[in-house]
Amino acid sequence: MKMIKAIVRPDKVDDIVDSLENAGYPAFTKINSVGRGKQGGLKVGEIFYDELPKTILLIAVNDDEVDEVVGLIKSSASTGNFGDGKIFIQPITEAYTIRTGETGI
């Protein structure tokens, strides 16, 4: 099992979620946040924005689903500009459903 953590532009979240749902991946956790990447913020006129709004999507998948889900996120989130985001893949050693006690995702 893997945890896909995608940090994306908030205005692309609906496109990403629609893409994931249409492909059979309806489960996710969404966290609104702020941050910046390598670009170090954004200057508009005389105003410098040190931190920009971002959304973190957490999606737990089986190992054989990682490439498909990452591809869906990349194709839905990309604008071709700085600030499109980053995707991290982390191993999940165990997962439990609180209500039932079942293991796995």
Swiss-Prot record:
Gene3D superfamilies: 3.30.70.120
Any Pfam family: P-II
GO MF annotation: an example: enzyme regulator activity
Stored SMART domains: P-II (SM00938)
Entry superkingdom: Archaea
Iron in keyword set: no
GO biological process, one term: regulation of nitrogen utilization
Keywords: Nitrogen fixation, Transcription, Transcription regulation
Coiled-coil region(s): none
Statement: the UniProt record of this protein carries the keyword Transcription regulation: yes
Cellular component aspect of the GO annotation: cytosol
InterPro entries, per the entry: N-reg_PII, N-reg_PII-like_a/b, N-reg_PII/ATP_PRibTrfase_C, N-reg_PII_CS
Purpose of the protein: Could be involved in the regulation of nitrogen fixation.
Family of the protein in this entry: Belongs to the P(II) protein family.
Protein name as it appears in the record: Nitrogen fixation nifHD region GlnB-like protein 1
Organism annotation: Methanothermococcus thermolithotrophicus
